[in-house]
Curated annotation (Swiss-Prot):
Belongs to the cytochrome P450 family. Enzyme of the diterpenoid metabolism involved in the biosynthesis of antibacterial oryzalides such as phytocassane. The gene is CYP71Z6. The keyword NAD does not apply. PANTHER family: CYTOCHROME P450 71A9-LIKE ISOFORM X1, CYTOCHROME P450 FAMILY 71 PROTEIN. It is a single-pass membrane protein. GO terms for molecular function: ent-isokaurene C2-hydroxylase activity; heme binding; iron ion binding; oxidoreductase activity. This is Ent-isokaurene C2/C3-hydroxylase. Keywords: Heme, Iron, Membrane, Metal-binding, Monooxygenase, NADP, Oxidoreductase, Transmembrane, Transmembrane helix. Its cofactor is heme. GO terms for cellular component: membrane.
């Protein structure tokens, strides 16, 4: 009798719980979510990405958007996501409702690599984030600061040109691995600009950075099921990402301490600041730390995360775009010849190019724009996250939804671009479209509050190397390869780099100076 009473009470309690949930659910207003493909338990929409048979996520998402529209709802495991594939929707999200979508989507791996979101690239929108970004914009990445690194860029590019001239003199049809050379160039420029010198720990840092970049390329089980402790335990990528970040953090802390010690020694000797590092990012941050008075104190931790953002961002974007540009020029000999003619006419026989020589090279700038259109380095931009439930184009976007803007798809859409799959720099002639974040059919660096703060630095790191390679060398494909046979597939992930290494043969046209 007593057992039956307990059973009845349990069943009654269960009935009340179920009924209350049903009533609560019925009383909740139904959300008008964007259209999207049908989902499966647990995995959500992931099977649709597999069914498109494209290894690149941005291509798979374009195929799905062509069926479901320019604003599309997906479920990446338990994570709600919206994919934007038109300029109008992008403008609504990134401009008109920018503040509502000002947070960053963090995967388990990016959270570990980028200091738990305490940096500028992936940090959530907050007072702290705003002050850190202000330091970047007003102290580290101003036009004057970027110009102050002109000598660094010119020296490192001249070094690369001399190395390639030596390769050209050695002959051979196998070609030079430009991925390695250009990556080294970018890393040397950013290291000198960041810490004032080549840095004895450079290789250790870059090795750890390369490992970290590989980990954030693909989704791990912890990214799909962030609420699951078990998924976090079994996921390998976040652990590898954390280990890599700790290695990089240790290197940066060593550099900071070495620089502090050097400045103290210089001060004790009455020498003032060492000229080599006078304008580097680290010296600027150490000055701010010493002066104080900033809304967010510039601690060593702040210096670490800001230097990490500077180095990791600049070491990836510029070489990726430069490799794509050279690959497109090799596939399009007419455009290559036109770009070379412009540079050679402007520089007129000098043995070394400076940035002052290339200010007026309009076609070179169009070539870079066209590369950024056809091969945006971040094809899905850096994803945003909805901070509060919002409405976009009549659809409800719940708080916490991740928002991906498929800039790769928008830049190849025939509704916004004539002959979108063709490489035509002339499309930007007498055209006001630029990459400053106001033309929503062309946002290679993003838009709004989260636009890339390093646009000026990134473009400066592109123009001089490209002009120098076009000026000093003619180029041919290895082993008699025809231009149309050059592989142009891209990688998947946050950055869409050229999948196959670019090997081409330099032929010296104007010999560089020897020193």
């Amino acid at each position: 009798m007593e057992d039956k009473l307990i059973l009845d009470l349990c069943l009654s309690a269960l009935f009340v719980v179920v009924l209350s949930k049903l009533v609560s659910s019925a009383m909740k207003p139904r959300l008008n979510l964007p259209p999207g493909p049908w989902t499966l338990p647990l995995i959500g929409s992931l099977h649709h990405l597999v069914m498109t048979k494209s290894p690149q996520t941005h291509r798979s998402l374009r195929a799905l958007s062509e069926k479901h529209g320019p604003i599309m709802q997906l479920w990446m495991g338990e994570v709600p996501a919206v994919v934007v594939s038109s300029p109008a929707v992008a403008e609504e999200v990134l401009k008109h409702q920018d503040l509502r979508f000002a947070d960053r989507h963090l995967t388990a791996t990016t959270e570990e690599v980028f200091f738990g979101g305490r940096d500028v690239i992936f940090g959530p929108y907050s007072e702290r984030w705003r002050h850190l970004r202000k330091i970047c914009m007003q102290e580290l990445l101003t036009a004057a600061r970027v110009r102050s690194f002109q000598g660094v860029r010119e020296r490192e590019v001249a070094r690369l040109v001399r190395e390639l001239a030596a390769d050209a003199g050695a002959g051979g049809d196998a070609g030079v691995n430009l991925n390695e050379r250009i990556s080294k160039l970018a890393n040397d420029i950013v290291m000198v600009s960041s810490v004032g010198g080549r840095c004895s720990h450079r290789d250790e840092f870059l090795d750890a950075l390369e490992v970290a970049k590989k980990q954030i390329t693909w989704l791990s089980v912890a990214d799909l099921f962030p609420s699951s402790k078990l998924a976090r335990m079994v996921a390998v990528a976040p652990r590898k990402g954390l280990a890599s970040r700790k290695r990089m953090e240790l290197v940066i802390r060593r550099i900071i301490q070495e620089r502090k010690d050097q400045l103290m020694d210089d001060s004790a000797a009455g020498a003032g600041e060492a000229a080599a590092g006078k304008d580097c990012f680290l010296d600027v941050l150490l000055r701010l730390q010493k002066e104080g008075g900033t809304p967010v104190p510039v601690t060593d931790e702040i210096i670490v995360v800001l230097l990490f953002d500077m180095i990791s961002g600049a070491s990836e974007t510029s070489p990726t775009v430069l490799i794509w540009t050279l690959a497109e020029l090799m596939r399009n000999p007419r455009i290559m010849a036109k770009a070379q003619a412009e540079v050679r006419q402007a520089v007129a026989g000098k043995t070394t190019i400076t940035e002052d020589d290339i200010v007026g090279l309009s076609y070179l700038k169009m070539v870079i724009k066209e590369t950024l259109r056809l091969h945006p380095p971040a094809p899905l931009l850096n994803p945003r996250k909805c901070r509060e439930t919002s409405q976009v184009m009549g659809y409800d976007i719940p708080k916490g939804t991740s928002v991906f803007v498929n800039m790769w798809a928008i830049c190849r859409d025939s509704r916004y671009w004539e002959d979108p799959e063709e490489y035509k720099p002339e499309r930007f002639e007498n055209n006001s479209v630029d990459y400053k974040g106001n033309n929503f059919e062309f946002l290679p660096f993003g838009s709004g509050r989260r636009i890339c703060p390093g646009i000026n630095l990134g473009v400066a790191n592109l123009e001089l190397p490209l002009a120098s390679l076009l000026y000093h060398f003619d180029w041919k494909l290895p082993n008699g390869m025809a231009p149309k046979d050059l592989d142009m597939h891209e990688t998947s992930g946050m950055v869409a780099a050229k999948l196959i290494t670019l090997n081409i043969c330099p032929i010296t046209h104007i010999a560089p100076s020897s020193a």
